[in-house]
Amino acid sequence: MQFDQVSVGKKANVFFDGKCVSHTVTLPSGERKSVGVILPSTLRFDLSTKEVMEVVDGTAYVSINGAAEVAYTAGQSWTVEAGGYFIIRAEQAVHYVCHFG
């Protein structure tokens, strides 16, 4: 996967004491995405906007809005609507792209 002709935020977005690190990418259309990595941990994300999380590498074990945990691997994705949440468990580094909206 590759994004062409984009603007990349120089400063990293660092969450959960460094367990989740990403950079914001803005496409020519103005659409924003973030490209990042989640290090081994279990984290909860509460969402104010809809997100589609796409796994690029690794395995993410995800519970959406309290549902049973599901494993997602490279090339798979999950969607959470605004106002929802997901809990992600990473046993090894999980590389991802977050598509907003």
How would you label these PLM feature ranges?
Residues 41-44, 49, 84, 101:
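A structural signal for the main folded, soluble domain(s) of proteins
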Residues 81-101:
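Ligand-binding loop in jelly-roll beta-barrel domains
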Residues 48-62:
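Short, conserved beta-strand element in jelly-roll/cupin
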Residues 16-18, 38, 45-47, 71, ...:
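Short solvent-exposed loop/turn micro-motifs enriched in small/polar/acidic residues
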Residues 65-86:
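Short acidic-glycine-tyrosine-enriched beta hairpin
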